[in-house]
């Protein structure tokens, strides 16, 4: 079942590249948010450094 889901999300072409599928039309309004979501963990990493700088790297 997971493999069927993965096949709908990812399209593996003949040369092995991964092409991401588009969101369904009902969720098109969330497209800008989905584009930014992979960057959010980087913000948490940077926040950890800012926090440690604020407490003088104790």
UniProtKB/Swiss-Prot annotation:
Residues 1-21 form a propeptide. GO terms for biological process: photosynthesis. The keyword Heme does not apply. It is a single-pass membrane protein. The chain crosses the membrane at residues 29-49. It holds the Pfam family PsbK. It is found in: Plastid, Chloroplast thylakoid membrane. One of its GO terms (cellular component) is photosystem II reaction center. Keywords: Chloroplast, Membrane, Photosynthesis, Photosystem II, Plastid, Reaction center, Thylakoid, Transmembrane, Transmembrane helix. PSII is composed of 1 copy each of membrane proteins PsbA, PsbB, PsbC, PsbD, PsbE, PsbF, PsbH, PsbI, PsbJ, PsbK, PsbL, PsbM, PsbT, PsbX, PsbY, PsbZ, Psb30/Ycf12, at least 3 peripheral proteins of the oxygen-evolving complex and a large number of cofactors. It forms dimeric complexes. HAMAP family: PSII_PsbK (MF_00441). Belongs to the PsbK family. This is Photosystem II reaction center protein K. It comes from Staurastrum punctulatum (Green alga).
